């Protein structure tokens, strides 16, 4: 018996590989609606495969470490907030769960806000462990942003209950006895670092919204401390807050 268009769409929705789709008897159905549904499903499957392939590529560092030690606890570490004029720098340390597959993970700057929020919830619910570390604006001014970032990363690492066997760090090195690999643009090359990037970003964004409630007029809830026009206008009208980095221009020239 010939399926209705809706019945055919349901059948197609349950096909999970291009190979099965191409061999399915529905390809012989010449009805326009059926052929359009097949084309749509083919595009969906190709996109899903592209996302999976990207995830597997980003899992390369983790896979190599696990090949050497299947029980290894691998910790990804990244930070957000080096460039803003206000607010702390925030680091996150993440140990992903065994058999993880958080499809869509990437550098937090490449992921939309809505997808970041979804991924952040999945990560918080699913990973083996995560922890945050902060360095304050005062510490940034005293130590410089690079050294303050190291402080934030070390604080995140120290909050973990489980001691990692290996660290994957985005373009930094830490003073620790734990073996580590520093990866340039690691948040786009390692799923563990990408997870840390997204979780740190969401944590810091929420923190800047709280600061915006305390100090309205700078639009911290939108610019998260970066030097937008609204932020600079706020500085000129309202002055410097305790959350501003006094070693960063134009604040440095205002003190």
UniProtKB/Swiss-Prot annotation:
**EC number(s) of the enzyme?**
3.1.26.4
Cofactor or coenzyme needed: Mn(2+); Mg(2+)
Give the note describing cofactor binding and stoichiometry: Manganese or magnesium. Binds 1 divalent metal ion per monomer in the absence of substrate. May bind a second metal ion after substrate binding.
Q: Name one GO cellular component term.
A: ribonuclease H2 complex
Which reaction is this enzyme known to catalyze? Endonucleolytic cleavage to 5'-phosphomonoester
Q: Does the keyword Metal-binding apply?
A: yes
Task: Enumerate the GO terms in the molecular function aspect.
Answer: manganese ion binding; RNA binding; RNA-DNA hybrid ribonuclease activity
Residue span(s) of domain RNase H type-2: 72-255
Where would you find this protein in the cell? Cytoplasm
Alphabetical keyword list: Cytoplasm, Endonuclease, Hydrolase, Manganese, Metal-binding, Nuclease
Which terms does the UniProt entry file under GO BP?
DNA replication, removal of RNA primer; mismatch repair
Q: What InterPro entries would the database entry show?
A: RNase_HII, RNase_HII/HIII, RNase_HII/HIII_dom, RNaseH-like_sf, RNaseH_sf
Instruction: Name which cysteines form disulfide bonds.
Output: none
Residues where a divalent metal cation binds:
78-79, 170
Family note: Belongs to the RNase HII family.
Q: What does this protein do?
A: Endonuclease that specifically degrades the RNA of RNA-DNA hybrids.
Quote the protein name from its UniProt record: Ribonuclease HII
């Amino acid at each position: 018996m010939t399926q209705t268009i809706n019945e055919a769409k349901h059948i197609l929705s349950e096909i999970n590989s291009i190979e099965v789709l191409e061999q399915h008897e529905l390809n012989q159905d010449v009805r326009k609606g059926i052929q359009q549904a097949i084309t749509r499903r083919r595009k969906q499957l190709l996109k899903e495969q592209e996302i999976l392939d990207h995830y597997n590529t980003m899992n390369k560092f983790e896979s190599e470490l696990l090949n050497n030690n299947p029980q290894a606890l691998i910790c990804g570490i990244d930070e957000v907030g080096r460039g803003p004029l206000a607010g702390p720098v925030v680091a996150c340390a993440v140990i992903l769960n065994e058999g993880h597959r958080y499809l869509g993970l990437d550098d937090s700057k490449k992921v939309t806000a809505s997808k970041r929020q979804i991924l952040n919830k999945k990560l918080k619910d699913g990973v083996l462990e995560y922890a945050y570390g902060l360095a304050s604006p005062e510490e940034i001014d005293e130590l410089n942003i690079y050294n303050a970032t190291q402080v934030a990363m070390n604080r995140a690492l120290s909050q973990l209950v489980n001691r990692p066997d290996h660290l994957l760090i985005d373009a930094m090195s830490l003073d620790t006895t734990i073996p580590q690999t520093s990866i340039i643009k690691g948040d786009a090359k390692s799923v563990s670092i990408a997870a840390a990037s997204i979780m740190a970003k969401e944590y810091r964004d929420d923190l800047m919204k709280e600061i915006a409630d305390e100090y309205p007029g700078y639009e911290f809830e939108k610019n998260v401390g970066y030097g937008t026009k609204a932020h600079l206008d706020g500085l000129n009208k309202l002055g410097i807050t305790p959350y501003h980095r006094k070693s960063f221009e134009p604040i440095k020239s205002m003190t």
